[in-house]
Amino acid sequence: MSSNIAITTEPEGKNKKGLKSDPFIFSISVGFIVVFVIATIALGEKARTTFSAIAGWLLENLGWMYIGGVSLVFIFLMGIFASRYGRVKLGDDDDDPEHTLIVWFCMLFAGGVGAVLMFWGVAEPINHAFNVPMANEESMSEAAIVQAFAYTFYHFGIHMWVIMALPGLSLGYFIYKRKLPPRLSSVFSPILGKHIYSTPGKLIDVLAIVGTTFGIAVSVGLGVLQINAGMNKLWSTPQVSWVQLLIILIITAVACISVASGLDKGIKLLSNINIAMAVALMFFILFTGPTLTLLRFLVESFGIYASWMPNLMFWTDSFQDNPGWQGKWTVFYWAWTICWSPYVGMFVARISRGRTVREFIGGVLALPAIFGVVWFSIFGRAGIEVELSNPGFLTQPTVVEGDVPAALFNVLQEYPLTGIVSAFALVIIVIFFITSIDSAALVNDMFATGAENQTPTSYRVMWACTIGAVAGSLLIISPSSGIATLQEVVIIVAFPFFLVQFVMMFSLLKGMSEDAAAVRRVQTRQWEKTDTPEKLEEHSSQPAPGYDDEGNPLPMPALEHDEDGNIVIPGNVVIEGDLGVVGDVVDDPEEAQEMGSRFKIVEQTRPQSRDEYDI
């Protein structure tokens, strides 16, 4: 895959400082992150209280908006998928995909939510089975377990990827179709026009960088907690702040090395290795655990997901059956995903050039969702089986005591080769977060520069370091409630970008409508009354419009256009038979514009054979 992308940058010369990054975008975004880190560490518990109050208000009053908004995006994307715009390519019309389907899937998955599945694979189903989301079933009953998996599939299935697919599709379209700079502001060019290069557009790019940094920082924070828990199980490493900060430092350092290597050498290699390792771990659980039960449940899982999704995607707990549950889980997930969706969207757009809109939507929504269902049906059901055979083994530490990061390693204790497999799982988690950080660093650099690989390596390394710094600061201020703090901050940061997504849908549809050519109406054979075998045979033997008697497509004349969009046919045109024209015939095409509605366009009704036209 070539790392050179044909992208037109904004019409600006070098800035006075000689920096490749835009000074406004760079200084505002980095300045905000630095001030946040310093203020968060300095204020400590006061910052924690402030985050909690703001996030609490958003969850209490606007949770319904997140639920309905994400479902609206899903419906919008399905409409685009089924429409004529589905055939449009993310790039020039003759571009081909740069990656095979398997490599494409590995990269978008590893750079997306792969690390999150490692964290929640066991923990989420057991949480929901114990504390039933709708509070209408007995804890750990069969019905409660089914509902638990329905919600888990909902959280990590199509809807999570819907949030990332919208900016990904929008970025891919405007960057590779319209050749605009690789910035989030480019998506809004049909609305803002030239202002994407001035303050309004740059503020959007600042929002994208800040959202990406905080979204990935939350993911890294959760991963660090899980890595620390795994090290505690294996080597009795203390679960304290200084150990977690050391883990962040090491992961960030390795991510800096990877990001300095670029997309092909670093991220692509790590992504492929990581997916292979994750699949190997999944097969280990499948074949060394209750294999038959897991296989049966794997099949059932797709039915559970399909039957529950229409209800869950619109459920907002209006009767307050389980107050606070949806804010803690569903709304947090949507806010978290929205927060880092510019990064995943830009990354997925970068690796999807040459694919059609329909391929993009279908692939980005279906492939990771299918893998997610398989993953949770195996890891989640394995955890449920461990709990059912030994009540309290998982629910007590994971749900009651809140030690969510250790859930996976607690299950691995019940499997053979515990030490080796747990260490193997740790490596997978670490690599997942390395790929997330270096992917985000590359994307942040593109948002800041408006081009790819136009800055020194130190810039991309700096972006990786900012992610580590934010994750570290959030864990420092409240080590005892690290997950809660991470959740609260991401809910606050995500809200502005959530509103931006509604505008993004309008802008994308407007841009596609402006760029796409009209689609011809379907044409069929014209039948006369068929009341004898001879007429049936005669009419059945006629070729369809545009095809010869042998079923081969007839050639189409190549149509050229002048600068005003008028069709230009060089040479003579031979027409056999009568020609009817509705409207006036003019010698000068410019006169046609003055004639207004009296000027008609004669549309070709079918392709003509070479014998029927001469150009």
Swiss-Prot record:
GO terms for biological process: amino acid transport; sodium ion transport. Residues 526-540, 600-615 have a biased composition (Basic and acidic residues). The keyword Signal does not apply. Residues 524-562, 589-615 are annotated as: Disordered. One of its GO terms (molecular function) is symporter activity. PANTHER family: HIGH-AFFINITY CHOLINE TRANSPORT PROTEIN, HIGH-AFFINITY CHOLINE TRANSPORT PROTEIN-RELATED. This is Ectoine/glycine betaine/proline transporter EctP. It comes from Corynebacterium glutamicum (strain ATCC 13032 / DSM 20300 / JCM 1318 / BCRC 11384 / CCUG 27702 / LMG 3730 / NBRC 12168 / NCIMB 10025 / NRRL B-2784 / 534). The gene is ectP.
